[in-house]
């Protein structure tokens, strides 16, 4: 008997015969194909039924068995049972050649597990995809798009769609231009500010590869196996099919893109993903703990993939899950984009001022640049003092980019500020030259772990690392010290110091490796085997008042007068005060530091003023030359009144204030490595080649890169095959094995002209020694900084060690590499043409 005719809701889209057949062609053929009821019908069996008729028959049996109405083609709210069935029992495995998922034959179809299918074509958000986000913000008119986007989002639930964020990711990924990337993010943020401000904060987190600040300890905790399992289940891949895609593309996001693109049908119509919804799903993953948490996480991942509309959404959902968007945006890109977006746009009802589109369009290039720079400085300063988007974004929505932002979102207890960093000098002579005319302090640079200690009026203590990670549980012995070191009248504070492993009996310093033997969590005081001492060197907050704008001399005096020293447990860094005229004294102090197992010395400007008499004396001590007597005896530091194109001739103002997240020459570090003939750089391994001969089973040589601080691009600088042990080679090969998440396809954010055998996921920093820096036609590092046609490379690079204490954002920059090259050229007095790399010296 034939199954009764069913009225089904059409998709409303005419599909030509050449395109993929819609679901109606399976469940409801054309009227012309209906059997003539007056003619005798043959006996119907599963073997004689067509695919379409069998599908109708099985659908009816499914519905009758469940005693429920037919599953609607347009269902937007699949139940968890439907999703489980859709993924586990109905999605066929893809063969090795990865053919698209299509209808199976009648003999393959499970008899009682049939759900309605949806064509995966045409489900993308056409409204969001047509917005030209990469336009210049001066000409991008949000008024043209806000009303339509609001109406579109309202029709789909009311919140901003993930499709718009995906559009921004796609455009950012398609260019290496920093300007284009920033423009794209600015316009995207403006649309959210005006059309859906409540989605702005989730969007910022999603666009910065994070779900919370580093001190919140909220992590997704998803392994590669979870992503692979979800890809197989949702997109119908078998193990071999998944491996084929991974081998071809190397990136989990690209694998998801290809799998989604080849998927002809989905079991239910995807429910549009929302920016808020995706972020909330990630929070649920991060907060899932205990029994059953892995299953909960897996279901959330699968639901996200199930609801993606289009291959690009799939790509960026997976990249978000592995927390590597690969869109060429660096840490500061989002801060710049936020600052600029709030110059153009504000939410409905906000009372801060913004510039009109017409007014901004009339600004000259230098006027616009100055306006941008001022806004960016405010936002960056606020974030450096209070690095939490959960607080920064709501304040921006209320105040815009104003000085009030620094007050409302400024320094706060138990929120770590980003630490101030010291510039590197080549040697003591270089340091003395930089600090002519200044009083400065020389401090031992201990070989330990930098720590930021917070204590409030109630006695609560938090300890943070230089990367802002919470490590209070690692140092319960330091926490117990706080009541003893806090002097009379001290109610709350933020101080900074170096935690060093010591012998409590003798006070002898222990190497950093000893400190690494400490457990990171759940450390009990009675079980501590590695004793530590906190050598404090700065005080940034006292009794509710920030001290960042106070001179270093004053901050140091408050620290040493208001806190109590406890020998071998809490004390001050060893230091001396000097000027450039005291070169012999400084040299002796430097030698004593290196003899005491320290890395070298830190040199810090004490005051905000220059003493001209000292400037003359120090200049004579260094080079025997007198300065022209055309200045006052005491003056404030300032930029040169006669700017020149030569950066080396420009004297920057050196203030003694504490500048969070800035690397300034008012703090200089002189390490013992820098005082020898061999310089070191912190480079990022990005690729490798198959070794030859004895090294054939390993990766050798290995390609290394410096970081461009402006674009975030990693610029190849050298290949290295020296300094590695066989044990290291094997561990490196095991880590970067084909098919693992540590191996990727050629990345757009790594600049190199050659073709390595394998590309590494950039994640490590290696300390490298070398003989010289050379101009090179082979490597792009620092190209444009010293030559328009050549980059820089290293002669005879040698691996020293992995810098486990550094992230890739702290690797050597192309700017610094160019600076070293210039200094080298000045020393050797060779012309650039005499220092050219033919491309083979490093091997």
Language-model features: where?
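Flexible, glycine/threonine-enriched loop-and-boundary segments that flank and lead into catalytic domains
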Residues: 421-441, 583-589, 605-693
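Structural signature of nuclease core domains in nucleic-acid processing machines
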Residues: 700-701, 706-731, 735, 758-759, ...
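Detector for conserved single-position "signature" residues within domains
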Residues: 591-598
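Short beta-turn/strand-loop junction motif enriched in small, turn-promoting residues
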Residues: 688-694, 709, 773
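C-terminal structured "cap/appendage" subdomains that terminate the fold
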Residues: 736-795
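N-terminal nucleic-acid-engaging modules of covalent nucleotidyltransferase systems
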Residues: 2-582, 611, 623, 630-636, ...
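C-terminal catalytic or substrate-handling cores of phosphate/nucleotide-
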Residues: 559, 666, 672, 676, ...
């Amino acid at each position: 008997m034939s199954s009764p005719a069913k009225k089904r809701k059409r998709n409303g889209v005419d599909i030509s015969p050449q395109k993929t057949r819609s679901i109606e062609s399976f469940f409801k053929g054309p009227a012309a194909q209906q059997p003539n009821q007056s003619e005798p019908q043959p006996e119907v069996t599963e073997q004689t039924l067509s695919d379409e008729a069998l599908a109708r028959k099985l659908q009816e049996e499914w519905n009758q068995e469940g005693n429920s109405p037919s599953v609607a083609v347009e269902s937007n709210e699949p139940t968890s049972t439907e999703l489980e069935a859709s993924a586990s029992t109905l999605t066929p495995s893809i063969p090795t050649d990865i053919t698209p998922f299509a209808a199976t034959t009648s003999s393959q179809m499970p008899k009682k597990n049939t759900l309605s299918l949806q064509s995966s074509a045409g489900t993308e958000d056409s409204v969001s995809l047509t917005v030209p986000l990469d336009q210049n913000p001066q000409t991008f008119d949000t008024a043209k798009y806000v009303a339509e986007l609001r109406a579109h989002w309202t029709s789909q639930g009311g919140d901003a769609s993930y499709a718009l964020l995906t559009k921004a990711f796609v455009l950012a990924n398609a260019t290496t231009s920093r300007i284009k990337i920033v423009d794209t993010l600015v316009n995207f943020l403006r649309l959210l500010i005006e059309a859906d401000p409540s989605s702005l904060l989730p969007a910022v987190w999603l666009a910065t590869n994070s779900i919370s600040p580093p001190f919140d300890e909220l992590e997704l905790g998803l392994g590669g196996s979870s992503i692979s399992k979800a890809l197989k289940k949702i997109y119908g891949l078998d193990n071999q099919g998944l491996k084929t895609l991974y081998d071809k593309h190397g990136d989990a996001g690209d694998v998801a893109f290809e799998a989604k693109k080849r998927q002809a049908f989905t079991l239910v119509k995807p429910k549009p993903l929302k920016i808020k919804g995706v972020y909330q799903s990630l929070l649920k993953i991060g907060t899932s703990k205990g029994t059953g948490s892995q299953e909960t996480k897996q279901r959330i991942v699968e639901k996200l993939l199930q609801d993606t509309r289009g291959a690009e959404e799939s790509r960026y959902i997976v990249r978000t899950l592995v927390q590597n968007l690969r869109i060429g945006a660096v840490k500061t890109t989002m801060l710049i984009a936020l600052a600029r977006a709030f110059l153009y746009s504000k939410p409905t009802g906000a009372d801060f001022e913004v510039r009109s589109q017409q007014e901004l369009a009339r600004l000259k290039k230098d006027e616009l640049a100055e306006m941008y720079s001022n806004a960016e400085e405010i936002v960056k300063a606020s974030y450096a003092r209070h690095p939490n988007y959960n607080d920064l974004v709501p304040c921006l929505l209320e105040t815009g980019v104003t000085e009030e932002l620094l007050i409302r979102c400024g320094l706060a207890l138990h929120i770590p500020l980003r630490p101030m960093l010291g510039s590197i000098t080549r040697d003591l002579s270089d340091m003395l030259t930089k600090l002519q005319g200044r009083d400065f302090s020389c401090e031992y640079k201990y070989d330990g772990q930098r720590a930021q200690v917070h204590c409030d009026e109630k006695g609560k203590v938090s300890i943070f690392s230089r990367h802002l990670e919470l490590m209070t549980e690692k140092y319960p012995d330091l926490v117990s010290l706080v009541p003893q070191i806090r002097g009379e009248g001290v109610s709350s504070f933020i101080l900074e110091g170096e935690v060093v492993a010591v012998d409590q009996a003798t006070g002898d310093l222990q190497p950093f490796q000893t400190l690494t033997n400490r457990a990171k969590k759940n450390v009990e005081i009675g079980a501590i085997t590695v004793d530590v001492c906190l050598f404090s060197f700065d005080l940034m907050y006292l009794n509710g008042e920030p001290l960042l704008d106070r001179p270093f001399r004053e901050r140091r005096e408050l620290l040493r007068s208001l806190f109590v020293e406890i020998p071998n447990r809490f004390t001050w860094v060893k230091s001396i005060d000097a000027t450039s005229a005291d070169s012999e004294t400084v040299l002796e102090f430097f030698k004593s530091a290196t003899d005491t197992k320290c890395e070298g010395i830190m040199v810090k400007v004490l005051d905000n003023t220059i003493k001209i008499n000292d400037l003359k004396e120090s200049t004579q001590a260094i080079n025997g030359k007198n300065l022209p007597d055309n200045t006052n005896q005491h003056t404030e530091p300032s930029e040169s009144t006669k700017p020149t194109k030569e950066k080396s001739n420009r004297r920057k103002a050196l203030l003694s204030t504490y500048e969070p997240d800035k690397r300034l020459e008012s703090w200089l570090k002189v390490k013992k490595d820098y005082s020898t003939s061999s310089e070191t750089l912190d480079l990022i391994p990005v690729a490798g080649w198959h070794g030859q001969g004895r090294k054939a089973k390993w990766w050798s040589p290995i390609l290394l890169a410096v970081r461009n601080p402006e674009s975030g691009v990693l610029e190849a600088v050298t290949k290295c095959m020296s300094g590695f042990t066989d044990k290291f080679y094997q561990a490196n090969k095991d880590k970067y094995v084909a098919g693992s998440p540590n191996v990727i396809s050629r990345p757009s954010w790594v600049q190199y002209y050659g073709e390595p055998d394998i590309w590494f996921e950039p994640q490590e920093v290696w300390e490298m020694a070398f003989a010289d820096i050379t101009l090179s036609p082979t490597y792009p590092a620092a190209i444009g900084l010293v030559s328009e046609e050549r980059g820089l490379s290293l002669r005879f690079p040698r691996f020293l060690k992995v810098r486990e204490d550094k992230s890739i954002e702290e690797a050597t920059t192309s700017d610094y590499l160019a600076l070293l090259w210039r200094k080298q050229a000045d020393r050797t007095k060779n012309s650039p043409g005499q220092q050219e790399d033919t491309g083979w010296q490093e091997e």
